[in-house]
């Protein structure tokens, strides 16, 4: 009796018994948070009312060959129109920053000096390359 009962329990509690027979993937029908250039009815779900305004563009530049509206915006306008970054849009910089412009000589030595090159693996490679090239100054 216990053997029959245990085999029945094993059949019921198989991992495949809990999984669905077909693997289906469900997609969300929530509105996209990505701003579109030409939207007839902008969705206000999950967005602040002041963050909806997208930069206006000419229709000829935003329509494709088939006449559909393209979702094309520059990177700077995407960042500034993002709801989470609406207050910080003017402060975000997407390029190289002048990190050594106001740095002192001490900071320069700490970042690019000989001891910092010796401590790291890539720094040692840099010193070897400069030594092989014949540089008199191996570091800053």
Curated annotation (Swiss-Prot):
Highest rank taxon of the organism: Eukaryota
Main location: mitochondrion
GO cellular component: mitochondrial large ribosomal subunit
Keyword entries, A-Z: Mitochondrion, Ribonucleoprotein, Ribosomal protein
Gene Ontology MF term list: structural constituent of ribosome
This protein's record includes keyword Protein transport: no
One GO term (biological process): translation
Location of this chain's protein in the cell: Mitochondrion
Family: Belongs to the bacterial ribosomal protein bL34 family.
Function: Component of the mitochondrial ribosome (mitoribosome), a dedicated translation machinery responsible for the synthesis of mitochondrial genome-encoded proteins, including at least some of the essential transmembrane subunits of the mitochondrial respiratory chain. The mitoribosomes are attached to the mitochondrial inner membrane and translation products are cotranslationally integrated into the membrane.
Quaternary structure annotation from Swiss-Prot or TrEMBL: Component of the mitochondrial large ribosomal subunit (mt-LSU). Mature N.crassa 74S mitochondrial ribosomes consist of a small (37S) and a large (54S) subunit. The 37S small subunit contains a 16S ribosomal RNA (16S mt-rRNA) and 32 different proteins. The 54S large subunit contains a 23S rRNA (23S mt-rRNA) and 42 different proteins.
Protein name: Large ribosomal subunit protein bL34m
Organism of origin: Neurospora crassa (strain ATCC 24698 / 74-OR23-1A / CBS 708.71 / DSM 1257 / FGSC 987)
């Amino acid at each position: 009796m216990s053997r029959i009962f245990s085999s029945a329990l094993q059949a019921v509690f198989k991992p495949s018994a809990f999984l669905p027979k077909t693997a289906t993937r469900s997609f969300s029908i929530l509105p996209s948070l990505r701003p579109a250039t030409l939207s007839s009815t902008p969705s206000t779900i999950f967005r602040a009312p002041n963050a909806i305004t997208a930069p206006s563009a000419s229709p000829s530049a935003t329509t494709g060959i088939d006449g559909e509206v393209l979702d094309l915006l520059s990177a700077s306008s995407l960042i500034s129109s993002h709801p989470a970054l609406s207050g910080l849009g003017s402060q975000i910089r997407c390029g190289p920053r002048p990190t050594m412009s106001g740095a002192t000589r001490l900071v320069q030595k700490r970042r690019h000096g000989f001891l910092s090159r010796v401590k790291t693996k890539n720094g040692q490679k840099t010193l070897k390359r400069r030594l092989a090239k014949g540089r008199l100054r191996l570091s800053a």
